[in-house]
């Protein structure tokens, strides 16, 4: 994820985020005797960045790199405003997940980076056409956790950039759907 911010805590010049796994695994792969298996995925159906994988899976989580509103066929920014750009970001995320046979509703966290907070209403319109995605998710009104960050600048002057975290419940390496166990989705929307 690349973005510009106007100020960082304590006047820092750089802030970095890291995600670390202790390598012990989770259901269904625990214990892994300390072996940490990481699976990297790239598909030509979404934009490819030579500096990062489209997704990296470990344990039962899959972290997708933030998607810009790029046409995967050309690698260029799509035409249009924030509505079209948000739609393309989500289409790119969906293409990455489809390339791994992971349903869109397995997304547990979405981070949306906007240049202008006033665009949030338009982004929400597009967002609701993607979530919930399946009949099961609609039945329980499942939507992932979401954070919106206002950035003072995004790569290629994009208006929006979206990243996602998936918990597909099948471990790493992925297992057949019929072999999954221990994953229960309960939405508590009150």
Label each residue range with its predicted role.
Residues 1-91, 95-109, 113-190:
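N-terminal presequence-like segments and the immediate start of the first folded domain
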